[in-house]
């Protein structure tokens, strides 16, 4: 297939003209922030390769083996707007599925089920706590489209 320029979603080097997504930001600085267990934001205009950068970072971290890195897009929570419980539930479901895919195990889904009866933002906190206790490596969450959430929903997820 002939390669072409892509501005609609993650880059696929086999069919898109692309540059190394990890060369688009200071990788050493980002890895230092991760080692220091700090939060950080990758901010750039629309369709500039943020998702491709996040996916590449996730792949790199998993390949290095010190962390379990999981990429999740939480844009689906946008439809629930200020319904915090729906947004938190959707976020937990998304994360559980992404962890299941990476671990090739249903354990994240089972942990998610054990938190379904919890209310509010404690659901997400307890889900992540239980998941981190069950896993042998520290977790790095790479969350895309967090800015799609608004108001109390955004604050609760963060």
Where are these regions (language model features)?
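Walker A/P-loop-proximal flanking segment of P-loop NTPase domains
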Residues: 1-48, 52-61, 126-131
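Amphipathic helix/helix-loop-helix segment enriched in hydrophobic residues with interspersed Lys/Arg
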Residues: 25, 30-34, 69, 99-115, ...
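The start of beta-strands in P-loop NTPase/AAA+ ATPase cores
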Residues: 38, 68, 139-140
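Switch/connector loops and helix/strand junctions flanking conserved nucleotide-binding motifs
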Residues: 50, 78-82, 151
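Alpha-helical scaffold elements adjacent to nucleotide-binding pockets in ATP/GTP-utilizing enzyme cores
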Residues: 52-57, 86-94, 156-157
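Conserved catalytic segments around the Walker B and adjacent sensor/switch elements
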Residues: 63-79
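Conserved NTP-binding/hydrolysis module of P-loop NTPases
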Residues: 81-105
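Conserved Walker B catalytic segment
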Residues: 115-158
């Amino acid at each position: 297939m002939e390669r072409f320029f892509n501005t609609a979603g993650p880059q696929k080097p086999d069919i898109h003209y692309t540059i190394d997504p990890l060369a688009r930001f200071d990788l050493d600085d980002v890895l230092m922030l991760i080692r220091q267990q700090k939060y950080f934001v990758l901010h750039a205009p629309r369709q500039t390769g943020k998702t491709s950068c996040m996916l590449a970072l996730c792949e790199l971290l998993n390949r290095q083996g010190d962390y379990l890195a999981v990429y999740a897009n939480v844009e689906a929570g946008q439809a629930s707007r200020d319904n915090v419980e729906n947004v938190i539930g959707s976020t937990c479901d998304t994360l559980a599925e992404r962890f299941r895919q990476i671990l090739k195990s249903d354990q994240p889904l089972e942990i998610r089920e054990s938190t379904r009866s919890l209310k509010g933002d404690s659901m997400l906190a307890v889900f992540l706590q239980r998941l981190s206790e069950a896993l042998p490596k520290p977790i790095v969450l790479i969350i895309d489209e967090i800015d799609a959430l608004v108001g109390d929903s955004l604050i609760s997820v963060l």
